[in-house]
Amino acid sequence: MKVFVVLAAIVAIANGLTSGSGVTTRYWDCCKPSCSWGGKASVTKPVRTCKANGNTTIDSNTQSGCNGGSSYVCNDQQPFTQGNVGYGFAAASISGQPESQTCCACYEMTFTNTAISGQKMIVQVTNTGSDLNGNHFDLMIPGGGVGIFNGCQSQWGAPSNGWGQRYGGISSQSECNQLPTSLRAGCNWRFGWFKNADNPSMKFTQVRCPTILTQKSQCVRTPGP
């Protein structure tokens, strides 16, 4: 196993892919993701963004619901599991990597502590954040806390601080019932596969984005890794 990990790291470096170790947090602010704006990176198209129903695609030039507009994150950008692997989306700040290099890039994370140590998750970066530090992935999990911005209030009528605490969100699975039905699967995922892990550390390596994610975001880097 150690040999495999070392070889994987060597291959990643040889291919010019980013790898390292870092931390995770969680959020779901309902805002239009930063990578949904055009011109952020060399991609096929910006990350799909939606009307207030969370399902209907809206033009990428539409202002964010967190800034007086009508564009919000799409419901299908919540996390899920296929086989033994978790999949989802994240805001990220990676040391030495500007947004032009991280938008719509994908990373495989291997968690290194808490109850999910050893579990793997692949995320596509769709957002950035002024409150994130180097090698920090903020996982998009409904009910995970709105953080700085609360677009969930205008989109779904959420409380002024979002569901639960502003940072960290709800604290029990039963509170997932406070969320709209369309967001509960991702909320429950946190208490299932993710085992309610609280900000686990991880190691990450950039990987080619799986179609299971790009079909949802509609964003692919050009050229991709």
From Swiss-Prot:
GO biological process: cellulose catabolic process
Record's description of how this protein is used: Potential use as a cellulase in industry due to its high catalytic activity at low temperature as well as its thermotolerance. Digests green algae (Ulva pertusa) under acidic conditions at 50 degrees Celsius, which suggests that it could be used for biofuel production from seaweeds.
Keyword Signal: yes
Temperature profile: Optimum temperature is around 40-50 degrees Celsius. Has more than 50% of the maximal activity between 10-70 degrees Celsius, and more than 30% of activity at 0 degrees Celsius. Stable at 50 degrees Celsius for 30 minutes. 60-80% of the maximal activity is retained between 0-10 degrees Celsius. Displays 40% of its maximal activity at as high as 80 degrees Celsius. Remains active at 60 degrees Celsius for over 8 hours. Approximately 50% of the activity is still maintained after 4-hour incubation at 70 degrees Celsius.
Intracellular or extracellular location(s): Secreted
pH sensitivity of activity: Optimum pH is 3.5. More than 90% of the maximal activity is maintained between pH range 3-5. More than 60% of the maximal activity is maintained between pH range 2-8. About 80% of the maximal activity is maintained even at pH 2.5.
Post-translational modification as stated in the protein's UniProt record: N- and O-glycosylated. Contains hybrid- and complex-type N-glycans.
Main location: secreted
Entry's EC annotation: 3.2.1.4
Keyword Hydrolase: yes
Record Pfam families: Glyco_hydro_45
Gene Ontology molecular function: cellulase activity
Keywords: Carbohydrate metabolism, Cellulose degradation, Disulfide bond, Glycoprotein, Glycosidase, Hydrolase, Polysaccharide degradation, Secreted, Signal
Matching InterPro entries: GH45_Enzymes (IPR052288), Glyco_hydro_45 (IPR000334), RlpA-like_sf (IPR036908)
Family: Belongs to the glycosyl hydrolase 45 (cellulase K) family.
The protein's name: Endoglucanase
Organismal lineage: Eukaryota, Metazoa, Ecdysozoa, Arthropoda, Hexapoda
